[in-house]
UniProtKB/Swiss-Prot annotation:
This is Ribosomal RNA small subunit methyltransferase G. Coiled coil: none annotated. One of its GO terms (molecular function) is rRNA (guanine-N7-)-methyltransferase activity. It catalyses: guanosine(527) in 16S rRNA + S-adenosyl-L-methionine = N(7)-methylguanosine(527) in 16S rRNA + S-adenosyl-L-homocysteine. It holds the Pfam family GidB.
Amino acid sequence: MAATEQNLRSTLKVGLEALQLQLSEQQINQLLAYQAMIAKWTQVYNLTSVRDPAEMMTHHLLDSLAAVPALQRYLHRSGLEQGSRLLDVGSGAGLPGVVIAICCPQVAVTCVDTVAKKAAFIKQAALALRLPNLTGLHARVESITESFDVICSRAFASLADFTKWSAGALAPQGVWMAMKGKHPADELLALPENIAMFHVEQLKVPGLDAERCILWLRPVS
């Protein structure tokens, strides 16, 4: 039986409580509306291979939400709580970029993807969900000349490729936030000497029995 909106709302609220993430009712409604948009667009444009609403909630929304507290802590420690800029590389359906834009309205989020339809979806989501802090960009990340305080990716590419391709968009004191499954020891070994991991966090995604982690990286001289 397909999950009803009430079931999804309940799963989301339980997940938010487990993550100790306090959101307003408006933000919860935006997250649910966003998932409904993904489901609708996926019927035509295949934004994601996950079609079941309950699975989409755990594998996409809650998986992305699990990274938000870590991002908020970093922004707080770095004095970037207001006016910071985040780039989500290979954003696809906007995961985690749109989720971050909903949860962190003070962060200007740009989601970049090389697939035009996916970038168009982000632009539509920004309008439909009334997110003035969200921008969709159809481009290769290597071509971006603006600078960002945080550059993130979720299951996008190897750490070496992710950092190499996006280095031109990193602000002088900027960092990379890479969302991964299992701790990618081999990928870390393949990083060039001028990029260092300075923090790693294990994530527990509510309702998902799988390994998840965030790796924080920055350039070193």
